[in-house]
């Protein structure tokens, strides 16, 4: 497929004279998707980690449920999804599986009720466990944490799990709910999952005002993850007399 990838190269010198001594030349190569695969992405492998604690009661939880259903509608059967809920305890609502039955997934989400505290660390750990089951170069793996950030367990527990996610190459995307959401806390979790310094804002965290806002954020995340090739190797073949 000749129009699958576009490859352009730029050299810092247009002409290379013949000299007795070695010369240093810089080449910038840029690969971009061609028209045939411009909208193609690798399948997703992600876990939705949902806060259903007492602090999420009312409008927050309603918005969360509708936001999650809007996200589910964007999935294809080749995507892998798991759904984790948490309050005092962590529950695997949907174990990691292909997103073939979107209507069934949405019915599960509709049944989520609020109650209890916000023990977040174990929930992130379970989300990481579920994503790790399918993690491979053939998938784009992520954890999506939806919460108001009102953790009632030790904050260090969530940070530790974010570090573990970063060590496995599985970033956490944060979606915050409610005007009192803990943005700094969620940002640090996201940053740590990228193995970045706290405050660097390397990770993605967004405040979700309504379900449509969540859908927009998710679509932007999808667009940024349109990976069509991984672990690419570039080979230079030189003419006789030249070495790279």
Give the positions of each predicted feature.
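Surface-exposed beta-strand/loop patches in extracellular or lumenal glycoproteins
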Residues: 231-237
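Short aromatic-acidic-glycine turn motif
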Residues: 94, 240-244
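Exposed acidic/Ser/Thr-rich ligand/metal-binding surfaces
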Residues: 8-231
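A generic structural motif
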Residues: 32, 237-239
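Proline/serine/threonine-rich low-complexity linkers at boundaries of modular beta-sandwich domains
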Residues: 1-6
């Amino acid at each position: 497929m000749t129009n699958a990838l576009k490859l352009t190269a730029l050299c810092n010198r247009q002409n290379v004279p013949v000299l007795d001594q070695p010369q240093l030349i810089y080449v910038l190569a840029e690969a971009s998707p061609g028209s045939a695969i411009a909208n193609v992405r690798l399948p997703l492998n992600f876990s939705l980690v949902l806060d259903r604690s007492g602090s999420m009661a009312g409008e927050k939880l309603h918005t969360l449920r509708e936001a999650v259903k809007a996200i589910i509608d964007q999935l294809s059967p080749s995507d892998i999804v798991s759904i984790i809920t948490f309050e005092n305890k962590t529950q695997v609502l949907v174990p990691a599986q292909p997103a073939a039955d979107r209507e069934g997934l949405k019915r599960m989400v509709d049944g989520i009720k609020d109650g209890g505290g916000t023990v977040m660390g174990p929930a992130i750990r379970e989300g990481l466990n579920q994503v790790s089951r399918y993690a491979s170069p053939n998938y784009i793996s992520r954890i999506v944490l939806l919460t108001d950030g009102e953790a009632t367990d030790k904050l260090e527990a969530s940070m530790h799990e974010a570090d573990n996610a970063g060590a496995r190459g599985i970033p956490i995307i944060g979606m915050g709910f409610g005007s009192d959401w803990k943005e700094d806390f969620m940002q640090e979790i996201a940053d740590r999952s990228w193995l970045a310094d706290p405050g660097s804002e390397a990770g993605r965290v967004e405040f979700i005002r309504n379900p449509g806002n969540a859908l927009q954020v998710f679509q932007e995340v999808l667009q940024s993850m349109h990976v069509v090739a991984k672990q690419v190797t570039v080979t230079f073949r030189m003419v006789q007399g030249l070495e790279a």
